[in-house]
Amino acid sequence: MEHTTAFNRRHALALAAAGLLPALSRAQASWPSKAVRFVVPFAPGGSSEIVARASAQELSRLLGQSVFVDNKPGGAGNVAMAEVARADDQHTVILGHIGTLAVNPFIFDKLPYDPLKDFKPVSLLAKVPSLYLVHPDLPVKNLKEFIALARKQPGRLNYGSAGNGSAGHLAMEYLKMATETFILHVPYRGTGPQLTDLLAGRLDAASVGAPAVMQFIKTGKLRCIATGTTQRLPQLPDVPTVAEQGWPGFEMTQWYGMLAPSSMPQAAVDKLAAACGKAMREPAALEHLAKDAAIAVGGTPAEFAAFIATERKRWQPVIARAKIKPD
């Protein structure tokens, strides 16, 4: 004990003599010392940008430096993830997603990044409810009736998604596994073309994030037969959850969190995480997210790391069962 104490004292004195202790303290206290680049690995628009911009606005105020969103789409998010994994400026972070963290590792033979080693989880920012939808002409009013119809006519019903491995693809395959039904998958290149065909009645069903379809539900152009949330949404109080309709424990949400490169000092990560927690509780952020039925979270780095691990375990068997491969 005496030896350890003496060593620590000598070490501290050496640092102090060299002028390093004050510099280290100042470096931790002054982060961020410039604008923070918040990379979104998808094209502008959609749930990812809604979450990123809602949090960035509040983070800019809390941190005293601009936090700006930079969209870098491509390769199912792999391009941006690889770039940020190599970033060493201490002021670049990225929006982590169910796809880049819990799906891509199991559908791509090789990734240009390691989701576990190349990043430090900062905070789970928000969850975006997945809604299960049908065209109004389909003779079903709820999920139970939809599943009954699918079982009665196996292979006759179809559903669309924004592409292989997309959140909508996963949501429907997860539902198929939970309900032991077969529904034909029709992949599209993006949510837009998928919604066009669903609205036109060329598709029977789909699962889509709430922000993209709330307007169509409200106007009766699409029918929501279930939500993937654990509780009913305030925006859709008459629509029961999947769990309520006979599949207890079922939950399907798209989720978004902040990641930092593994090279970022832990002190900066912790400061950023604390700011994220505050940002996601701010009235302005809550109001922004509520308009699109998104649910604010704002957890700690440890909580986000545990959540990612749980999601990876959940989606690996779903991906294997459905034999999902990238487009």
Specify the residue positions occupied by each region the protein language model found.
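An extracytoplasmic/periplasmic, membrane-proximal ligand-sensing/linker region
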Residues: S33-A35, K218, E244, Q266-D327
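Beta->alpha turn/N-cap motifs
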Residues: L95-T100, N104, S161, T191, ...
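Hinge/capping helix and adjacent helix->loop/strand transition within the periplasmic-binding protein
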Residues: R86-H91, F106-P193, V242, W255-H288
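N-terminal secretory signal peptides
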Residues: M1-F7, H11-P22, R26
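N-terminal (or domain-start) structured segment
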Residues: A27-K117, R156, N164, T181-D204, ...
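Short loop/turn segments at beta->alpha junctions
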Residues: N8, A76, N142, P187-G190, ...
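C-terminal lobe and pocket-closing loops
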Residues: K127, V213-R281, T310-K313
